[in-house]
Amino acid sequence: MKVSSQTTGELAENKFETIYDERYWESPPFKLVSDFEPKGSQPEAIEKLVDGLKKGEPFQTLLGVTGSGKTYTVANVINQIRKPTLVIAHNKTLAAQLYNEFREFFPENRVEYFVSYYDYYQPESYLPAKDQYIEKDAMINPKIEQMRLAATASLMSRQDVIVVASVSCIYGLGNPENFQKMGFELKVGDKVHRKEILEKLIDIQFERNDLELMPGRFRVKGDTIDIIPGYFDDIIRIELFGDEVDRISEVDKQTGQRKEDMDYFFVYPARHYVIPEEEQKSAIQFILEELEERLPELGLLESHRLKQRTLYDMEMIQETGSCKGIENYSRHFDHRQPGEKPFCLLDYFPDDFLLVIDESHQTIPQLHGMYNGDRSRKKSLVDYGFRLPSAFDNRPLKFEEFEKYMKNVIFVSATPADYEREHSSRVVEQIIRPTGLVDPEVEVRPLEGQVRDVMQEIRKIVERGDRALVTTLTKKLAEELTEFLAKNEIKARYLHSDIKTIERTEIIRELRLGKFDVLVGINLLREGLDIPEVGFIGILDADKEGFLRNSKSLIQIIGRAARNSSSRVVLYADNMTDSIKSAVQETERRRSMQIAYNEEHGIVPTTIRKPIREKVVDITDTKHIPKTDIPNVIIELDAEMREAADRLDFERAIQVRELIKKLEKEIKAV
């Protein structure tokens, strides 16, 4: 990372030895920048969470209703606690939203983004029933790869760091000790030969390219070396005078203008998987020993397949330093024992870092399930001679391994699950919204005539220009209800798991635009359904206990109407189940607290105004594209998909990817 002030501490005897000195400890404190002060439930929540962390309580839960400003509360906690922080979200889209929010709150500190760098990923697998081997197929997004490197480089060089990550942060990553040890520092006045610098850059996976400079590459012109580190946008220019570093400066990549001079610059490796040469040799020896042990355990075909593949991979590693699927040998390169956990992003943090798990009721189950899913896929690869058993150790963390990092944890959720409640020393509530919006009124009505009744309610809200959501228990009921409403001249659509992502997004967009008035669905808890135009929610068969009718699910469904100041919710039930009682009581408790706050502060709640996004493409348009034009259209769409991913607009990137797949199928069908 770049530093423009004088270094502290003496340069080690080996001029390329990593220095982890006072610069790390002297990094600036967090500085929260915001136009507003904590309000509503926020001040008390901030105070309690900070108090719990200072008292060394490892687990706390922030129970915050939608729209109460949970992210702002967490930002205030980070600002006071001043520890490097990891925020985990359960998908890329939510991670991108949090990343942008934290960047606005902390413009003077390092806010980084760490998610899977694949725009498209087909894992390696083998289907024994069909005798079908599926090779790994992936499309890496270079911008996200750059952001991942920036995250680890920041963690190595300063304390004022917030990393927003998806659950991919528990997957294997290069050894942080190697990443740190193989980096090197250059200072103005250093005695060093140009050849030494170039060799060191090659050692840490930089590529020389004198024509096209991009992250992870360098070029050489006489005594000037231009580098773009893998985690950087601009050029770092090293100017030598003989065998001495004469000048180090940052140069704008686009204009070529010098932006600033610096006293020194620390160059981290261009990739996370970097292995010192001596360790590479010993790792290859261990891999060959494992191969010899494994071959007698396999059949003739499988042993031949494994031997041929492994020897080829070792030859590639010796020649080029890498091979396809090198991560499957990571246990040997990391010198880990069989079954020992892999290194991951969490190992780049200091021991006492702050961990925030957003939407914990969804994120914790994801973290639980990662390991088993990975192992079951690899089992057939190992059993049939496509991979050595050590491939099992290229894996995500087991949940019990992840728990060992949970020393300062804040779970954030509107509906915390049993895990969070059982582990937390305190559950801090954040019920009052600074905006004044109140949870909707909830009414329970009998099952008899529920369809006719819900239809009457829909007509009322349509007259005032609002929309409605209706939840059913099965896909068949959703389709039948939609058809019944249509016959009664109510514009309705249904939404369920069979509908593709791109169509689902477009259905929600058309609901907001008023092209239809009612959306009928089964599980309306998924992201993307925060629709302020919704003024009524009807929950059919609410007394049928189960996943979609338990108290947590009911509270979440009711919360979908909390963005509209005049919204109402009706539950249709003959039996007041414990789940219904709990959901109604909790909603009424939250309503009364918010109403009292509004009256005390003279707040009149108003419906949230949320812009409606432009349509990306019309999927029906593909039928009208001439077959000869499809390849060019795919090229254009691929560029659009990458641009969307670069902007962290993953919803749009997924839409375009789905369209590309549709067009590729049409080409194959010709």
Swiss-Prot record:
The keyword Nucleotide-binding applies. GO terms for biological process: nucleotide-excision repair; SOS response. It is found in: Cytoplasm. GO terms for molecular function: ATP binding; ATP hydrolysis activity; DNA binding; excinuclease ABC activity. Residues 631-666 form the UVR domain. Residues 453-612 form the Helicase C-terminal domain. Residues 51-433 form the Helicase ATP-binding domain. Keywords: ATP-binding, Cytoplasm, DNA damage, DNA excision, DNA repair, Excision nuclease, Nucleotide-binding, SOS response. It holds the Pfam family UvrB. GO terms for cellular component: cytoplasm; excinuclease repair complex. InterPro entries: Helicase/UvrB_N, Helicase_ATP-bd, Helicase_C-like, P-loop_NTPase, UVR_dom, UVR_dom_sf, UvrB, UvrB_inter. The keyword Cytoplasm applies. ATP binds at residues 64-71. It comes from the Archaea. A motif (Beta-hairpin) lies at residues 117-140. The beta-hairpin motif is involved in DNA binding. The UvrABC repair system catalyzes the recognition and processing of DNA lesions. A damage recognition complex composed of 2 UvrA and 2 UvrB subunits scans DNA for abnormalities. Upon binding of the UvrA(2)B(2) complex to a putative damaged site, the DNA wraps around one UvrB monomer. DNA wrap is dependent on ATP binding by UvrB and probably causes local melting of the DNA helix, facilitating insertion of UvrB beta-hairpin between the DNA strands. Then UvrB probes one DNA strand for the presence of a lesion. Belongs to the UvrB family. Forms a heterotetramer with UvrA during the search for lesions. Interacts with UvrC in an incision complex. HAMAP family: UvrB. This is UvrABC system protein B. It comes from Methanosarcina mazei (strain ATCC BAA-159 / DSM 3647 / Goe1 / Go1 / JCM 11833 / OCM 88) (Methanosarcina frisia). The lineage of its organism: Archaea, Methanobacteriati, Methanobacteriota, Stenosarchaea group, Methanomicrobia. The gene is uvrB.
